[in-house]
Swiss-Prot record:
Protein name: Bis(5'-nucleosyl)-tetraphosphatase, symmetrical
Keywords: Hydrolase, Iron, Metal-binding, Nucleotide-binding
Pfam families recorded: HD (PF01966)
Lineage top rank: taxon: Bacteria
Matches recorded under PANTHER family: BIS(5'-NUCLEOSYL)-TETRAPHOSPHATASE, SYMMETRICAL (PTHR35795:SF1), SLR1885 PROTEIN (PTHR35795)
Bridged cysteine pairs (disulfide): none
Molecular function terms from GO: hydrolase activity; metal ion binding; nucleotide binding
InterPro entries from the UniProt entry: Diverse_Catalytic_Enzymes (IPR051094), HD/PDEase_dom (IPR003607), HD_domain (IPR006674), YqeK (IPR005249)
Function in brief: Hydrolyzes diadenosine 5',5'''-P1,P4-tetraphosphate (Ap4A) to yield ADP. Can also hydrolyze Ap3A, Ap5A, Ap4G, Ap4U and Gp4G, always releasing ADP or GDP as one of the products, but it exhibits a marked preference for Ap4A, which is mainly exerted at the substrate affinity level.
Length: 194
């Protein structure tokens, strides 16, 4: 799918505010890709489409989870977790996107996971730091992403803040988010490469 078609699809489906967020994620991911030698066309496509299913009916999302066998564990969660995996499945099976990196970046943009590809990392970070975000402490994360040279450390910090937020709100934390946090935790002295 070319980027113009992706933008057209997203604009037709998403509320204006969410569509603009998606464009900002794509733009932010491109900037990060230029810093970290990523694929700008892949991150642009994933950025534009990452929230394509965010407002889909929850019943429809559960149906997609079952239809494409995305994992029964997902059936315990709402749209905040489901929209990524559901969107990736729809983009693959209904829109013919077959680039695994783009699909994985869409699938895990909210939760993260262990051993993310560079494209996944760039979308995960861009979704958190795009200019429209006003999350407390986001400027520190932006500085880390743009100026401190480590995607992995940035992912760890985002995951840590996300998990702490969810715990404070008594919201169940998705297992892949915990796995992501643990995997990118530098305090255990594992060495990782961006």
């Amino acid at each position: 799918m070319n980027i113009e078609k992706a933008k057209r699809l997203a604009k037709e489906k998403l509320p204006e505010k969410r569509y603009n967020h998606s464009l900002r994620v794509a733009e932010t991911a491109i900037k990060l890709a230029e810093i970290y030698d990523g694929d700008t066309s892949k991150v642009e496509l994933a950025g534009v489409l990452h929230d394509f299913c965010k407002y889909d009916d929850l019943g429809k999302m559960y149906q997609i989870v079952r239809q494409y066998e995305l994992g029964n564990d997902l059936l315990s969660y709402g749209s905040e977790i489901l929209h990524g995996p559901v969107c990736a499945a729809i983009m693959e099976h209904e829109y013919g996107i077959n680039d695994e990196e783009v699909l994985m970046a869409i699938k895990y943009h909210t939760t993260g996971r262990q051993q993310m590809t560079k494209t996944e990392k760039l979308i995960f970070i861009a979704d958190y730091i795009e200019p429209g975000r006003t999350i407390p402490g986001v400027d520190d994360i932006r500085d880390m992403a743009y100026n401190q040279g480590s995607l992995d450390k940035t992912i760890y910090e985002i995951s840590k803040r996300t998990v702490l937020f969810l715990i404070q709100k008594d919201i169940t934390v998705y297992n892949k988010t915990i796995d992501c946090l643990n995997y990118y935790n530098y305090s255990d002295e594992r060495i990782k490469d961006d």
